[in-house]
Amino acid sequence: MPTQFAPLQNDTFLRALLRQPTEYTPLWLMRQAGRYLPEYRATRARAGSFLGLAKNPDFATEVTLQPLDRYKLDAAILFSDILTVPDAMGLGLYFIEGEGPKFERPLRDEKAVQALKVPELGSLQYVFDAVTQIRTELKGRVPLIGFTGSPWTLACYMVEGGGSDDFRTVKAMLYNRPDLMHHILQTNALTVAAYLNAQIDAGAQAVMMFDTWGGALADGAYQQFSLHYMREVMKHVKTEKDGVRIPSIVFTKGGGLWLKEIAAVGADAVGLDWTVNLGAARAKVGERVALQGNLDPSILFAQPDQIRAEVAKVLESFGKHSAGSGHVFNLGHGISQFTPPEAVTVLVDAVHELSRPLHK
């Protein structure tokens, strides 16, 4: 494995996460390599399937770099899927066109849950190979983000056997058999920490934990079944590699209510969805963590002038930068597959241009 990667030319994103001064507000987009890009759709057709794309380091590298060839983004994010982890745990991941991910062997009874173990990371070598290959081919243009799902979010898919509207099965287990739920979450936490560390060893320069379904939990249950295990993960994730800081981001969609508690989880930055007021969030936790977000992805269906106006609102909501403040611009969730690619050009240019006066 090459230990010598090209020197980083643009570290704005990493500095913002560490609340160091930057010349402008950096940005990247959740799902920036995705179906809204015609070049992504062409590569996916060649790969034959989503898993054919994600499990092949050459294809994964190609699609990771596509948005960077088109837009002046400040970070790349590994092209993969959070469900590679339960797949490695033996649950049998497959995709049905139009229905999304499914598991052949969901965790529905005590026997299945008790059999769950931290997997051999060798079964995820294709992910680590992709990380190293992407980092090499980036040639230092921008940093590379590695990522994982949170223990709770992974558990939702593992128990439900796929996506869900109401999380009935996983919540029934949580309330009826909390002992089984905790066993799943503890196993997931150990796995996820090792998985992120292996991505860091392979070349990831920052890591992010997506708690997509944390917001489905009641207050109280969130702290016990999601937040606690994210804290467990953060305790074990490397904060540096070869003397260089590796910043971390956590993101609970629908987690605005628990902002102060999320900020204390041990990550350098907290991602926000579009329901949160960024300025209010900064007032609450901005001395402690950087913030990432939080434009409504649907704004990208508006006219260019409207996109610029909404970008300005988000930037002004965060306000002028001071010592120890950090903001990474992003959407409040993943970009829609129906987004016109040219809208992203407007967004990127607007963020870079309109944020500069706020950093003086």
Swiss-Prot record:
Pathway participation? Porphyrin-containing compound metabolism; protoporphyrin-IX biosynthesis; coproporphyrinogen-III from 5-aminolevulinate: step 4/4
Reactions catalysed: uroporphyrinogen III + 4 H(+) = coproporphyrinogen III + 4 CO2
Q: Tell me which GO cellular component terms the UniProt record holds.
A: cytosol
Could you tell me the Gene Ontology terms of the biological process aspect for this record? Answer: protoporphyrinogen IX biosynthetic process from glutamate
The molecular function GO annotations come to: uroporphyrinogen decarboxylase activity
Which CDD domains does the record match to this protein?
URO-D (cd00717)
PROSITE patterns per the record? UROD_1, UROD_2
InterPro entries, per the entry: UROD/MetE-like_sf, Uroporphyrinogen_deCO2ase_HemE, Uroporphyrinogen_deCOase
Give compartment(s). Cytoplasm
Q: At which positions is substrate bound?
A: R31, Q32, A33, G34, R35, D81, Y157, T212, H333
Keywords (A to Z) from UniProt: Cytoplasm, Decarboxylase, Lyase, Porphyrin biosynthesis
This protein's assembly is summarised as: Homodimer.
Function text: Catalyzes the decarboxylation of four acetate groups of uroporphyrinogen-III to yield coproporphyrinogen-III.
What name appears for this protein in its UniProt entry?
Uroporphyrinogen decarboxylase
Q: What is the native source organism of this protein?
A: Janthinobacterium sp. (strain Marseille) (Minibacterium massiliensis)
- The gene it comes from is hemE
